[in-house]
């Protein structure tokens, strides 16, 4: 049984065999297999191009503030209690108020 399987498929196993000299043998494929490989290579290149574009457009993610552990824990508790959207809304409102007061106080000092 294995011999029949081997005889039927051994040609496919010859793909890119490396000899001890380091020279690669030519791939042995049918025209249908060659078309499938060409399509697969095209798709891999498209995927690689997409990854390169993502990499090139990426930015370093630097946190705006560093939270203390106890503050982060309180925020997690609030998120669990009120939900992420409500927590975001409340924190953004508070931060805007604090920063607008700080900016106006700095303007008055000058």
From Swiss-Prot:
Changing residue 13 to A: Decrease in functionality. The chain crosses the membrane at residues 8-22, 32-55, 67-81, 89-102. InterPro entries: Membrane-integrating_Mistic (IPR021078), Mistic_sf (IPR038193). Residues 23-31, 82-88 are extracellular. It is a multi-pass membrane protein. It is found in: Cell membrane. Gene3D superfamilies: Mistic (1.10.220.90). Its main location: membrane. Keywords: Cell membrane, Chaperone, Membrane, Transmembrane, Transmembrane helix. It comes from the Bacteria. The keyword Transport does not apply. Residues 1-7, 56-66, 103-110 are cytoplasmic. One of its GO terms (cellular component) is plasma membrane. As a fusion partner, can be used for high-level production of other membrane proteins in their native conformations, including many eukaryotic proteins that have previously been intractable to bacterial expression. Chaperone that facilitates the production and integration of integral membrane proteins into the bacterial lipid bilayer. Monomer. This is Protein mistic.
């Amino acid at each position: 049984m294995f011999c029949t399987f081997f005889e039927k498929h051994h040609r496919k196993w010859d793909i890119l065999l490396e000899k001890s000299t380091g020279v690669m043998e030519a791939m042995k494929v049918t025209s249908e297999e060659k078309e499938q490989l060409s399509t697969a290579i095209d798709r891999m290149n498209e995927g690689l191009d997409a990854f390169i574009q993502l990499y090139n457009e990426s930015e370093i993610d630097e946190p705006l503030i560093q939270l203390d552990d106890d503050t982060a824990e309180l925020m997690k508790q609030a998120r669990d209690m009120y939900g992420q959207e409500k927590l975001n809304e409340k924190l953004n409102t508070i931060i805007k108020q604090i920063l607008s007061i700080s900016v106006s106080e700095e303007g008055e000092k000058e």
